[in-house]
Amino acid sequence: MPRVKRGVTARARHKKVIDAAKGYRGRRNNVYRIAKQAVMRAGQYAYRDRRNKKRVFRALWIARINAGAREHGLSYSKFMNGLKKASIELDRKVLSDMAIHDKVAFAAIVNQVKANVA
């Protein structure tokens, strides 16, 4: 059985890591040992933040809905309670977009909610 030299394989593996570290600062983008650690850490951050993104956006939507509801004299919790009672099934993403960009439609929803809360 012939001897296998690892030069080609090692070069390919190193190149893959160095390419993934493109754009990093300092030695993180061209020294394999350091780049490997940086790429692994970047992957961990990416994995974590794909999950955190969902929480962050939900918090943003809630803040926007709260601001829009308070302009019409309702708190967020009373507004959401009224939505459930009025059986209006719009999600927070759509409601926050309406509160920012379509104030007339949002005001109409708030008026429906006020009728059900009272």
Swiss-Prot record:
It holds the Pfam family Ribosomal_L20. InterPro entries: Ribosomal_bL20, RIBOSOMAL_L20_CS, Ribosomal_protein_bL20_C. GO terms for molecular function: rRNA binding; structural constituent of ribosome. It comes from the Bacteria. Belongs to the bacterial ribosomal protein bL20 family. The lineage of its organism: Bacteria, Pseudomonadati, Pseudomonadota, Betaproteobacteria, Burkholderiales. It comes from Ralstonia nicotianae (strain ATCC BAA-1114 / GMI1000) (Ralstonia solanacearum). Binds directly to 23S ribosomal RNA and is necessary for the in vitro assembly process of the 50S ribosomal subunit. It is not involved in the protein synthesizing functions of that subunit. The keyword Plastid does not apply. This is Large ribosomal subunit protein bL20. GO terms for biological process: ribosomal large subunit assembly; translation.
